[in-house]
Amino acid sequence: MGRPPCCEKIGVKKGPWTPEEDIILVSYIQEHGPGNWRSVPTHTGLRRCSKSCRLRWTNYLRPGIKRGNFTEHEEKTIVHLQALLGNRWAAIASYLPERTDNDIKNYWNTHLKKKLKKINESGEEDNDGVSSSNTSSQKNHQSTNKGQWERRLQTDINMAKQALCEALSLDKPSSTLSSSSSLPTPVITQQNIRNFSSALLDRCYDPSSSSSSTTTTTTSNTTNPYPSGVYASSAENIARLLQDFMKDTPKALTLSSSSPVSETGPLTAAVSEEGGEGFEQSFFSFNSMDETQNLTQETSFFHDQVIKPEITMDQDHGLISQGSLSLFEKWLFDEQSHEMVGMALAGQEGMF
C-alpha cells in the first residue's frame, strides 16, 4: 500500500498559510538555510508537513521571486521546455529561477496552452492559405510562362513573316530592275553565241553548195567528228577560229600570191602555141604577161577572201572538205583563162 501522506496524520494543519507561519518559516530558513525539510516542522513548532513547508518556501517565501506578467522570452522558454519535458514543472522552473513552478504551471494552463492552440490553428490556416496561395501562384506563374511563351512564339512567327515579306519585296524590285536593264543591253551567254554563230554560218554558206559536196563529205565524215554542213558552235570554237584566222592570214596571202603565177604559166604557153610567127608570139606573150600580172592581183584578193575561212575552218574542224575547194578553184581559173584567150584573139585580129 505504501507510505500514507504526511498531511493525513493526526494534528497536521491543512489550508492556507497564515502570516505568522510564514514569518516563523522564513526566520528558520535564514538561520539554518533551505534543506532537511523533514526536521523543519519539529524545530519550528509548525503544525505543517515538510512538503508544505518546502513548497511554501520555494513558491512564495524565498527571495528573488518575480511576480507579474511573463515576458515573451519566458513564454518561448516555457513552450520549448514543455515540448521537451512535458508537465515536469519543477524541472522547467529550474531554468527560470525568478519564476516558481506553480506560477509556471498556472500560467501554462490558463494562458499559454490556449494561446499556443490558437497559434497552431492560425498557423494551419496560414499554411493552408500559403499552400493555396502557393498553388495559385504556381498556376499563375505557369499560366504567365505559357502566355509569355505563346507571345514569344507569336512574335517569332510575325518576325519570320515580316522577314519573308521584306525578302520578297527586295526580290521583286531587283528582278524588275534586272529585267528592265536586260532589255536595252545584250547579255553575252553561251546560248547567244551559239545562235549568233549558227546565223553567221547560214549567211556565209549556200545550201546549194552542200549538195555538190556530198560526195566529198561522205569521205570526210569518217575522219572528222563533224560533217561539212554542221558547225559545232561554242565559245571555245569561235575563239579558236578567230585565233587561227589571225595566225593564218600571212599564209593565205603567200598561197594566193604564189598560186596564180604557177597556174597562169601554162596559159601563156597555150596561147603562144596557137600563134604562128615569132613576133606575134613575143608580142602576145608580152601582153599576156601584163594581163596575167593584173589577173594575179585581182585573183589574189579573191583568194584572200575565199581561202582564209576555208583553210582555218578546215584546220580546226574540217567543216569544208578539200574537194569542194579544188572544184571552186578550177571553175574560177577556167573561167578566167577563157576570158583571157578571148582577149588575146581580139587583140590579134586588131593587129592584122
UniProtKB/Swiss-Prot annotation:
InterPro entries: Homeodomain-like_sf, Myb_dom, Myb_TF_plants, SANT/Myb. Its main location: nucleus. One of its GO terms (molecular function) is DNA-binding transcription factor activity. Residues 119-148, 207-228 are annotated as: Disordered. Pfam families: Myb_DNA-binding (PF00249). Residues 208-224 have a biased composition (Low complexity). It is found in: Nucleus. GO terms for cellular component: nucleus. Residues 129-147 have a biased composition (Polar residues). Induction: Induced by drought stress, salt stress and abscisic acid (ABA). Induced by infection with the cauliflower mosaic virus (CaMV). Induced by cold stress. The keyword Transcription regulation applies. Expressed in leaves, flowers, guard cells and lateral root primordia. Residues 9-65, 66-116 form the HTH myb-type domain. Disruption phenotype: No visible phenotype under normal growth conditions, but mutant plants exhibit increased susceptibility to drought stress. GO terms for biological process: abscisic acid-activated signaling pathway; defense response; positive regulation of abscisic acid-activated signaling pathway; positive regulation of DNA-templated transcription; positive regulation of wax biosynthetic process; regulation of abscisic acid biosynthetic process; regulation of abscisic acid-activated signaling pathway; regulation of DNA-templated transcription. Residues 37-61, 89-112 bind DNA. Keywords: Abscisic acid signaling pathway, Activator, DNA-binding, Nucleus, Plant defense, Repeat, Stress response, Transcription, Transcription regulation. Signal peptide: none annotated. Interacts with HDA15. PANTHER family: MYB FAMILY TRANSCRIPTION FACTOR, TRANSCRIPTION FACTOR MYB96. Transcription activator involved in the activation of cuticular wax biosynthesis under drought stress. Binds directly to DNA consensus sequences found in the promoters of genes encoding very-long-chain fatty acid-condensing enzymes involved in cuticular wax biosynthesis. Functions together with MYB94 in the activation of cuticular wax biosynthesis. Involved in drought stress response through abscisic acid (ABA) signaling. Mediates ABA signals that enhance plant resistance to drought by reducing stomatal opening. Plants overexpressing MYB96 exhibit a dwarf growth, altered leaf morphology, reduced lateral roots, and enhanced drought resistance. The gain-of-function mutant myb96-1D (activation tagging) plants exhibit deposition of epicuticuar wax crystals on leaf surface. The gain-of-function mutant myb96-1D (activation tagging) plants accumulate high levels of anthocyanins and salicylate (SA), express pathogenesis-related (PR) genes constitutively, and exhibit enhanced resistance to Pseudomonas syringae infection. This is Transcription factor MYB96. The lineage of its organism: Eukaryota, Viridiplantae, Streptophyta, Embryophyta, Tracheophyta. The gene is MYB96.
